[in-house]
């Protein structure tokens, strides 16, 4: 399997994951206790179009414009910021994935976007080290880094996108 910028951890900046888990759990618990709908996480909200200059997804202006056009044409697919419940569940799921990593025996290629600010590259590195320690396969015992790429590898500029696709196809040739 080839994974493009997998969410094995969320990029939280300076906040430790354990603190983010605690805060998100407390916020989710309190909203459930009060019978409220799960609110957005702090600083987040409904879909708010982001300019190309400020986007965290791609360096390719045409692919970004296409993505934005889809959101304009089909508002029902627009994604806003994460809810507290989503964050809590995502943090739990990524922790569980890391815990179960040594049991994975399927050969894996982790394609890592070097300039990713959405998911944690550090956790991808840890994941590959855990697989290597368990004598399982993460191609090269480390992620395959696409230098300069943002999160959406398959929507990046052609030279970055082609590098990601070529790496995946070569991996599939070696692991039929």
At which residue positions do the language-model features occur?
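Hydrophobic/aromatic beta-strand patches that form the interior of the parallel beta-sheet core
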Residues: 2, 109-111, 144
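Short alpha-helix in the alpha/beta-hydrolase fold that links the catalytic acid
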Residues: 106, 120-131
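Active-site nucleophile elbow and catalytic-triad environment of alpha/beta-hydrolase enzymes
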Residues: 78-100
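Short, conserved loop/helix-junction motifs that constitute active-site signature segments
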Residues: 101-105, 130-137
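Acidic catalytic loop of the alpha/beta-hydrolase fold
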Residues: 115-119, 134
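Short beta-strand/loop motif that positions the catalytic acidic residue
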Residues: 104, 110-112, 116
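Alpha/beta-hydrolase-fold enzymes
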Residues: 1-78
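Catalytic active-site module of serine/aspartate enzymes centered on a nucleophile-bearing elbow/loop
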Residues: 134-176
């Amino acid at each position: 399997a080839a994974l493009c910028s997998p969410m094995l951890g969320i990029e939280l900046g300076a906040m430790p994951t354990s603190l983010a888990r605690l805060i998100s759990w407390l916020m989710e618990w309190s909203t459930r206790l009060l019978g409220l709908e799960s609110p957005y996480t702090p600083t987040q909200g409904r879909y708010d179009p982001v300019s190309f200059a400020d986007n965290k997804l791609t360096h390719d202006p045409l692919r970004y414009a296409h993505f934005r056009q889809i959101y304009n044409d089909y508002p029902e697919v627009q994604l806003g910021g994460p809810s507290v419940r989503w964050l809590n569940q995502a943090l739990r799921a990524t922790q569980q994935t890391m815990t179960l990593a040594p049991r994975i025996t399927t050969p894996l290629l982790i394609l890592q976007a070097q300039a990713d600010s959405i998911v944690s590259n550090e956790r991808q590195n840890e994941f590959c080290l855990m697989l290597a320690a368990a004598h399982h396969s993460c191609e090269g015992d480390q992620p395959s880094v696409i230098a300069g790429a943002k999160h959406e590898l398959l929507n990046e500029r052609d030279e970055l996108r082609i590098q990601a696709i070529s790496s995946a196809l070569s991996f599939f040739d070696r692991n039929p």
